[in-house]
């Protein structure tokens, strides 16, 4: 993990690097997944077939599942402590939650996803891979979701929403001092500037930008890291009735 404070500094990490000590993507894959590489490979196979067939990923993603999706997600594990309780908000096809669970079996991972077709896929994948991962169909803003999954140490997300919405959804699911880890793109500082006041009003503190995987990825991953303030926490409004899981 590297802390960055400007676009110039971020560019020095996220531009393509040619000499990282790894000749192929698969060397980085082996470093990250190690003895669980066969599980990661099976997940890639499921994404490339069932995932694309059901429209969870576009067909053009099939040839870049390892570098663009699995590695991009799994390197966030650099920011997680042993045994962390993690919720993946808007998990979609299981990103970043499933790569994290594969790379770090010590984590307690919940995949939170509102759409039935995605939830069905996620439950099939979890069963197929034999992962100790819970899949919950629901939205982060629903009160029963917090009751179901409890207060988490970390809320992760990838390509889900802007930081104001992510903060609103994440804070009620976190313990005091818990972390929000949002994988973001090249306009991250503009987004922070735009939403910082709203984030602070919702209880987010210590907002920073970090990059993960700088030692072994050609394009390290940009993550917004912020914490749930100790004193200010908002409970979600009750939305609808409890859904059948």
From Swiss-Prot:
Native source organism of the sequence: Mycobacterium leprae (strain TN)
EC number assigned by the record: 2.1.1.-
Residues annotated as binding S-adenosyl-L-methionine: 90, 95, 140-141, 158
EC class (word): transferase
GO molecular function: rRNA (guanine-N7-)-methyltransferase activity
Superkingdom to which the source organism belongs: Bacteria
Chief location category: cytoplasm
GO cellular component, one term: cytosol
Keyword Transferase attached: yes
Protein name as annotated: Ribosomal RNA small subunit methyltransferase G
Keyword Isomerase among UniProt keywords: no
Family per similarity comment: Belongs to the methyltransferase superfamily. RNA methyltransferase RsmG family.
Localization annotation: Cytoplasm
Physiological role: Specifically methylates the N7 position of guanine in position 518 of 16S rRNA.
Gene designation: rsmG
HAMAP family in the cross-refs: 16SrRNA_methyltr_G
Lineage: Bacteria, Bacillati, Actinomycetota, Actinomycetes, Mycobacteriales
Keywords in alphabetical order: Cytoplasm, Methyltransferase, rRNA processing, S-adenosyl-L-methionine, Transferase
């Amino acid at each position: 993990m590297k802390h960055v404070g400007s676009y110039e500094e971020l560019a020095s990490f996220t531009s393509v690097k040619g000499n990282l000590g790894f000749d192929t993507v698969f060397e980085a894959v082996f470093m990250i997944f190690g003895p669980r590489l066969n599980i990661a490979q099976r997940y890639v196979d499921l994404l490339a077939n069932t995932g694309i067939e059901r429209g969870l990923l576009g067909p053009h993603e099939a040839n870049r599942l390892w570098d663009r999706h699995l590695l991009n997600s799994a390197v966030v594990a650099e920011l997680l402590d042993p045994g962390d309780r993690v919720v993946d908000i808007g998990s979609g096809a299981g990103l970043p939650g499933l790569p994290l669970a594969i790379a770090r079996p010590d984590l307690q991972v919940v995949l939170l996803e509102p759409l039935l077709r995605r939830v069905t896929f996620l439950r099939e994948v979890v069963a197929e891979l034999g992962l100790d991962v819970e899949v919950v169909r629901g939205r982060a803003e629903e009160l029963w979701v917090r009751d179901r999954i409890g207060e988490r140490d970390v809320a992760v997300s990838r390509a889900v929403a802007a930081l104001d919405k992510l903060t609103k959804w994440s804070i009620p699911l976190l313990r005091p001092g818990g972390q929000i880890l949002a994988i973001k793109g090249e306009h991250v500082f503009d987004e922070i500037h735009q939403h910082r006041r709203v984030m602070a009003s919702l209880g987010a503190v210590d907002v920073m930008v970090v990059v993960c995987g700088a030692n072994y990825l050609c394009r390290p991953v940009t993550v917004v890291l912020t914490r749930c303030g100790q004193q200010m926490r908002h409970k979600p409004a009750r939305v609808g009735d409890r859904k059948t899981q």
